[in-house]
Regions:
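Glycine-rich beta-strand-centered segment in the early N-terminal region that forms part
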Residues: 22-39, 51-97
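Short, well-ordered loop/turn sites that connect or cap secondary structure elements
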Residues: 81-84, 142, 235
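NAD(P)H dinucleotide-binding glycine-rich loop of Rossmann-like/cofactor-binding domains
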Residues: 89-152
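Mid-domain Rossmann-like dinucleotide-binding core that forms the NAD(H)/NADP(H) cofactor-binding site
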Residues: 126-198
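N-terminal Rossmann-fold cofactor-binding loop
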Residues: 175-179, 222, 245, 270
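Short amphipathic alpha-helix with an adjacent loop that forms part of the alpha/beta core around
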Residues: 200-214
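C-terminal capping/lid region of NAD(P)-dependent oxidoreductase domains
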Residues: 213, 298-305, 313-332
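Glycine-rich phosphate-binding loop and adjacent beta-alpha segment
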Residues: 226-298, 331-332
Length: 332
C-alpha cells in the first residue's frame, strides 16, 4: 500500500516520490476508499510543475481523477448515506489526492456509481466528460439537431464532446491535425471531420451548405491561433466561441469585423470554476448522467496503458508523451 506525493514543484519525474501508506481509519461522517485506478492527465503534470491554475499546497498527493471501492465507513454514514456501503464503486469528488492506495473523505465528497460501471472508465469521468458537458452548456444550450464546431477533435476532450453532443441530439463538425485521426472521430459518432487548415475550412463550409445546415451557434476552441479563427469564421450571427485550451500556444487575435458584424461572443471555460458555479446537487446529476452513458457504451475513452503504482515513473514518462494513443492510468 503506497501513495505518490510531492514536497516541491518541478519536473514530475524528478519531484514525485512513492512512500508506504498504512490503512487509515475513517472518522464520523467519513468513508475509507480503496482506490482502483487514477488517471495521469496533462493537468496533473502541470499541477506538479506548478504551472496549473490551481497551485499545490505542499506537501500533497496529486491526482485529479480516480475511482475506488468503499472499504469501510465511519459513524453516522450508514444512516445518512445508505448508498455508501462497503464494496460500492465510487467517484471521489475532492481533488487532488487520487494517486494513493487509500483515501479518507467526507461522505459528502463521494458519489456512488451504478454497479455496472467499469472502474477504469469511472476513473476518467471527472475531467474530460465533465468538460464536454460544461462546454456544451457554457452558453445557451444548442437546440437539438443544431451544429457544434470544434478543433482538437481527436483529443480526449474532443472525443468526449463528440459523444456527449450525440447523446444530446447535436451534430458535430470537427477539425483534426492529422488525416489518420479522421476515422477515429467518425467511429464514435462525429458527423463531419476535416483537416484543420485552410482547405479544411473551405470543405467544411461546402459540406454545411450541401446539407442545408444553418451556421453553427457554438464553437469550442482548444487550440488558439489560426485554428481558433477558422472556428470564428464558421459561426453564425450571435454565435458563441468558447476557449478552454491553448495547444498552439498562440494568442487569439480576432479581426474586428467578425466581432462587429457577426456580434460574436467570446468566452473562456475552466472546469473548476464552472463546477463552482453550479447549483447544489447539479454536479452529482451530471456525473450520474455521464456514468450512465459510459455504461451503455455511448461514452468511452481510449486507454493507452495502465501501470501499477510501483511503476509510477514509467507511467509519468508515458503520460508526458504526445504520441500516446489514449489515457495513462495508475492502478492500485
Amino acid at each position: 500500500m503506497s501513495q505518490i506525493y510531492i514536497s516541491r514543484t518541478g519536473p514530475p519525474g524528478e519531484v514525485s516520490e512513492r512512500r508506504p501508506q498504512p490503512r487509515p481509519v475513517p472518522g464520523p461522517g467519513e468513508v475509507l476508499i480503496r482506490m482502483k485506478a487514477a488517471a495521469i492527465n496533462p493537468a496533473d503534470l502541470n499541477f506538479i510543475e506548478g504551472t496549473y491554475g490551481k497551485k499545490p499546497v505542499l506537501p500533497c498527493v496529486p491526482g485529479m481523477e480516480g475511482s475506488g471501492v468503499i472499504d469501510s465507513v465511519g459513524e453516522t454514514v450508514a444512516d445518512s448515506f445508505p448508498n455508501l456501503t462497503p464494496g460500492t464503486l465510487v467517484l471521489p469528488l475532492a481533488s487532488p489526492g487520487n494517486w494513493s492506495t487509500w483515501r479518507v473523505l467526507p461522505a459528502t465528497d463521494v458519489l456512488a456509481l451504478p454497479a455496472a460501471t467499469d472502474p477504469l472508465q469511472a476513473a476518467l469521468l471527472r475531467i474530460n466528460p465533465a468538460t464536454a458537458w460544461g462546454l456544451l452548456h457554457a452558453a445557451a444550450a444548442p437546440a437539438p439537431d443544431s451544429w457544434v464546431v470544434q478543433n482538437a477533435a481527436s483529443s480526449a476532450a474532443g472525443h468526449c464532446v463528440i459523444q456527449v453532443a450525440k447523446s444530446l441530439g447535436l451534430k458535430t463538425l470537427n477539425f483534426v491535425r492529422r488525416p489518420e485521426s479522421i476515422a477515429s472521430c467518425l467511429a464514435i459518432g462525429a458527423d463531419l471531420v476535416f483537416l484543420d487548415d485552410a482547405d479544411g475550412l473551405t470543405a467544411a463550409k461546402a459540406a454545411l451548405a450541401d446539407a442545408g445546415a444553418p451556421a453553427p451557434a457554438l464553437a469550442l476552441n482548444a487550440v488558439g491561433g489560426d485554428s481558433a479563427l477558422r472556428l470564428l469564421d464558421l459561426l453564425g450571427i450571435g454565435g458563441n466561441h468558447v476557449t478552454y485550451g491553448a495547444m498552439a500556444r498562440q494568442a487569439l487575435k480576432v479581426p474586428n469585423g467578425l466581432l462587429i458584424f457577426k456580434t460574436l461572443v467570446l468566452r473562456g471555460f475552466w472546469l473548476s470554476r464552472w463546477q463552482e458555479s453550479l447549483e447544489p446537487g447539479a454536479l452529482t446529476e451530471i456525473y450520474l448522467t455521464l456514468a450512465r452513458l459510459a455504461n451503455i457504451g455511448r461514452l468511452q475513452q481510449q486507454i493507452a496503458a495502465t501501470y501499477p503504482i510501483e511503476e509510477y515513473l514509467a507511467a509519468l514518462t508515458h503520460a508526458a508523451t504526445s504520441a500516446r494513443n489514449g489515457k495513462v492510468l495508475l492502478t492500485f
